[in-house]
């Protein structure tokens, strides 16, 4: 078994508005190994996106903890969490969230700029990542000049440019047609093999989830089962 990279210990999340309490996550526990490709499957409102926010240190659990590479996130300062997100984690969303006034190359380079890399390294690494997703010829195009599939590929390149150990993906193909969705998942698998990057994908789509090596099901804020989807149609 691969070394554990990320571990969730009894994560709970409760939101309170006035006298109204809403429990979104209930004692969620699981782990992700180094280089593992995992899917969490659930319908809209099951708590998947909230879980990803906690895993990425974008929100704080009501109770429980997230442990990344042996380090509890509850012990990290806000600055340390930001550094972790920049250096060790990648994020892919259903919507690409590219900066509209910047080129594909500049969008991919943004995490490197934030990480204060050297200018020459920034350009070469960003261009190499665009090449890895098959878009080096679109480096100087803005998002409005790219197709939906191309924009999502740029977003994936941006998520991977710092060579993160884990990528958290929230419905990464939700806005794509079947052909582009298939292409994106082939790309994730290739990057996993070449770079050893671990992927945790949340989705409602069983056809996409079965491409991962492991699948968990989430219902009403609880992990309810480990699925076996290899033969799913």
Curated annotation (Swiss-Prot):
Part of the ABC transporter complex LolCDE involved in the translocation of mature outer membrane-directed lipoproteins, from the inner membrane to the periplasmic chaperone, LolA. Responsible for the formation of the LolA-lipoprotein complex in an ATP-dependent manner. Belongs to the ABC transporter superfamily. Lipoprotein translocase (TC 3.A.1.125) family. The lineage of its organism: Bacteria, Pseudomonadati, Pseudomonadota, Gammaproteobacteria, Enterobacterales. One of its GO terms (cellular component) is plasma membrane. Its EC number is 7.6.2.-. Residues 6-233 form the ABC transporter domain. InterPro entries: AAA+_ATPase (IPR003593), ABC_transporter-like_ATP-bd (IPR003439), ABC_transporter-like_CS (IPR017871), ABC_transpr_LolD-like (IPR015854), LolD_lipo_ATP-bd (IPR011924), MacB-like_ATP-bd (IPR017911), P-loop_NTPase (IPR027417). The complex is composed of two ATP-binding proteins (LolD) and two transmembrane proteins (LolC and LolE). GO terms for biological process: lipoprotein localization to outer membrane; protein localization to outer membrane. It is found in: Cell inner membrane. GO terms for molecular function: ATP binding; ATP hydrolysis activity; transmembrane transporter activity. Transmembrane segments: none annotated. PROSITE patterns: ABC_TRANSPORTER_1, ABC_TRANSPORTER_2, LOLD. ATP binds at residues 42-49. CDD domains: ABC_MJ0796_LolCDE_FtsE. The gene is lolD. This is Lipoprotein-releasing system ATP-binding protein LolD. SUPFAM superfamilies: P-loop containing nucleoside triphosphate hydrolases. It is a peripheral membrane protein. Keywords: ATP-binding, Cell inner membrane, Cell membrane, Membrane, Nucleotide-binding, Translocase, Transport.
């Amino acid at each position: 078994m691969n070394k554990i990279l990320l571990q969730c210990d009894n994560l709970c999340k409760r939101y309170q508005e006035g006298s109204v309490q809403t429990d979104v996550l209930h004692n969620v526990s699981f782990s992700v190994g180094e280089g593992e490709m995992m899917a969490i499957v659930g319908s809209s409102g099951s708590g998947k996106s909230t879980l990803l926010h906690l895993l990425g240190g974008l929100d704080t659990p009501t109770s429980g903890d997230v442990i990344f590479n042996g380090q509890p996130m509850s012990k990290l300062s806000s600055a340390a969490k930001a550094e972790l997100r920049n250096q060790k984690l990648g994020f892919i969303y259903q919507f690409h969230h590219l900066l509209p006034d910047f080129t594909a190359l500049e969008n991919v380079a943004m995490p490197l700029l934030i990480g204060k890399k050297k200018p020459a390294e920034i350009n070469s690494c960003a261009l190499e990542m665009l090449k890895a997703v098959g878009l080096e010829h679109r480096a100087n195009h803005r998002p409005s000049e790219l197709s939906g599939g191309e924009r999502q590929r740029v977003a994936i390149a941006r998520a991977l440019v710092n060579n993160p150990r884990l990528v958290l993906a929230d419905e990464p193909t939700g806005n794509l047609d079947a052909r582009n969705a298939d292409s994106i998942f082939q790309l994730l698998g290739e990057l996993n093999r070449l770079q050893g990057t671990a992927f945790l994908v949340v989705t409602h789509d069983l056809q996409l989830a079965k491409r991962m090596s492991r699948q968990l099901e989430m219902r009403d804020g609880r992990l309810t089962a480990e699925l076996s989807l290899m033969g799913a149609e």
